[in-house]
Amino acid sequence: MSLLTEVETPIRNEWGCRCNDSSDSLVVAASIIGILHLILWILDRLFFKCIYRFFKHGLKRGPSTEGVPESMREEYRKEQQNAVDADDSHFVSIELE
């Protein structure tokens, strides 16, 4: 006898969804969490460079420059900009000639 004849097939009324109560609070909460997760994932993929630079450098503008000569301020600004530019070095820049 074949194994296929031994397998029980479900009857027609068991094919439907057993959880017909979609207004269950757990189902609603899971749906909301799933949608929020999807939105955050899409935003992360679109703006990952900005987001991670923000977390790395934060809102800090650096130490106070009160009483510091302008030449030293400019040197500090260049140094900070070079540090930010070095962070972008893992992106490949292709120039076509």
UniProtKB/Swiss-Prot annotation:
<keyword id="KW-0449">Lipoprotein</keyword>
<keyword id="KW-0946">Virion</keyword>
<feature type="compositionally biased region" description="Basic and acidic residues">
    <location>
        <begin position="71"/>
        <end position="80"/>
    </location>
</feature>
<dbReference type="GO" id="GO:0044694">
    <property type="term" value="P:symbiont genome entry into host cell via pore formation in plasma membrane"/>
</dbReference>
<keyword id="KW-0945">Host-virus interaction</keyword>
<feature type="site" description="Essential for channel activity, possibly by being protonated during channel activation, and by forming the channel gate and the selective filter">
    <location>
        <position position="37"/>
    </location>
</feature>
<feature type="site" description="Seems to be involved in pH gating">
    <location>
        <position position="41"/>
    </location>
</feature>
<feature type="glycosylation site" description="N-linked (GlcNAc...) asparagine; by host">
    <location>
        <position position="20"/>
    </location>
</feature>
<keyword id="KW-0472">Membrane</keyword>
<dbReference type="Pfam" id="PF00599">
    <property type="entry name" value="Flu_M2"/>
</dbReference>
<comment type="subunit">
    <text>Homotetramer; composed of two disulfide-linked dimers held together by non-covalent interactions. May interact with matrix protein 1.</text>
</comment>
<dbReference type="InterPro" id="IPR002089">
    <property type="entry name" value="Flu_M2"/>
</dbReference>
<keyword id="KW-0407">Ion channel</keyword>
<keyword id="KW-1133">Transmembrane helix</keyword>
<dbReference type="GO" id="GO:0016020">
    <property type="term" value="C:membrane"/>
</dbReference>
<protein>
    <recommendedName>
        <fullName>Matrix protein 2</fullName>
    </recommendedName>
</protein>
<feature type="topological domain" description="Intravirion">
    <location>
        <begin position="44"/>
        <end position="97"/>
    </location>
</feature>
<comment type="function">
    <text>Forms a proton-selective ion channel that is necessary for the efficient release of the viral genome during virus entry. After attaching to the cell surface, the virion enters the cell by endocytosis. Acidification of the endosome triggers M2 ion channel activity.</text>
</comment>
<dbReference type="GO" id="GO:0140321">
    <property type="term" value="P:symbiont-mediated suppression of host autophagy"/>
</dbReference>
<keyword id="KW-0597">Phosphoprotein</keyword>
<feature type="lipid moiety-binding region" description="S-palmitoyl cysteine; by host">
    <location>
        <position position="50"/>
    </location>
</feature>
<keyword id="KW-1015">Disulfide bond</keyword>
<comment type="similarity">
    <text>Belongs to the influenza viruses matrix protein M2 family.</text>
</comment>
<keyword id="KW-0812">Transmembrane</keyword>
<dbReference type="GO" id="GO:0020002">
    <property type="term" value="C:host cell plasma membrane"/>
</dbReference>
<feature type="topological domain" description="Virion surface">
    <location>
        <begin position="1"/>
        <end position="22"/>
    </location>
</feature>
<dbReference type="GO" id="GO:0005216">
    <property type="term" value="F:monoatomic ion channel activity"/>
</dbReference>
<feature type="region of interest" description="Disordered">
    <location>
        <begin position="59"/>
        <end position="88"/>
    </location>
</feature>
<keyword id="KW-0813">Transport</keyword>
<feature type="transmembrane region" description="Helical; Signal-anchor for type III membrane protein">
    <location>
        <begin position="23"/>
        <end position="43"/>
    </location>
</feature>
<keyword id="KW-0406">Ion transport</keyword>
<feature type="modified residue" description="Phosphoserine; by host">
    <location>
        <position position="93"/>
    </location>
</feature>
<keyword id="KW-0735">Signal-anchor</keyword>
<keyword id="KW-1043">Host membrane</keyword>
<dbReference type="GO" id="GO:0051259">
    <property type="term" value="P:protein complex oligomerization"/>
</dbReference>
<keyword id="KW-0375">Hydrogen ion transport</keyword>
<keyword id="KW-1182">Viral ion channel</keyword>
<keyword id="KW-1032">Host cell membrane</keyword>
<keyword id="KW-1083">Inhibition of host autophagy by virus</keyword>
<dbReference type="GO" id="GO:0015078">
    <property type="term" value="F:proton transmembrane transporter activity"/>
</dbReference>
<keyword id="KW-0564">Palmitate</keyword>
<dbReference type="GO" id="GO:0055036">
    <property type="term" value="C:virion membrane"/>
</dbReference>
